[in-house]
């Protein structure tokens, strides 16, 4: 008589500096787009759960904002607190670093991770970009000295390379437990939240160097009416100049933002979407704790 498979479940914090590939990693593990991504640092502002259930293993990944050194605004302080809090009461930590580049912000994350008691996996991202893999060795050896308790896994979050190994190692380190979430649930976030994040992603991708970081998105209406899902999104900025940048010449930029966001929404929500966007100036919102609380950034 064979033993029944052991059910395992636990929380897995994905941590690292801004723009190192944490959200891309989560999306590839889940096999679908959940966390927004862009080339801009600090794209992720909230902790978000991504739930992967496969057989007896349920890994509850916590995608975190990148730890950074700027604490000048309430929003920055909130993001750093969110990232730090994710390291508490988790069962596994996946620390994502670049294959060669090491920054002061990587060091900041390292100093946090060195104190955790749970298993650590060091995911060395973008390893696929090196033709000669032996070039990785000096950096891997140095990383092993910094975190001797960690197991090092070279990966490519974008291409999905070696993620099966990473997931296997995560699963082996999760505690024996009943699953926390239904098998078909992939996140703890609401559809309204995901819609707002998709709009913010398109703003960040379209604006490039012009990007005003003092932007956020609030969903004012999210209503299914027959085959059409009606979504009204309010884009908040801090200055009139930022409003003009987002709207663009004759409204062309906000039109493109809406078109791109709508396409992703229709895929995510499996519905035809009617999306309307407005831009409003709300001066100083990113440094106003009352405003941040009303926008869902603070508890």
UniProtKB/Swiss-Prot annotation:
Membrane topology: Peripheral membrane protein
Start and end residues of each stretch annotated as G3: 63-66
UniProt-annotated binding residues for GTP: 16-23, 63-67, 125-128
Residue ranges of domain Era-type G in the record: 8-176
Keywords: Cell inner membrane, Cell membrane, Cytoplasm, GTP-binding, Membrane, Nucleotide-binding, Ribosome biogenesis, RNA-binding, rRNA-binding
Cystine pairings recorded for this chain: none
GO MF entry, a single one: ribosomal small subunit binding
GO cellular component terms given for this protein: cytosol; plasma membrane
Endpoints of the signal sequence: none
Positions of region (G1): 16-23
Protein purpose: An essential GTPase that binds both GDP and GTP, with rapid nucleotide exchange. Plays a role in 16S rRNA processing and 30S ribosomal subunit biogenesis and possibly also in cell cycle regulation and energy metabolism.
Name of protein: GTPase Era
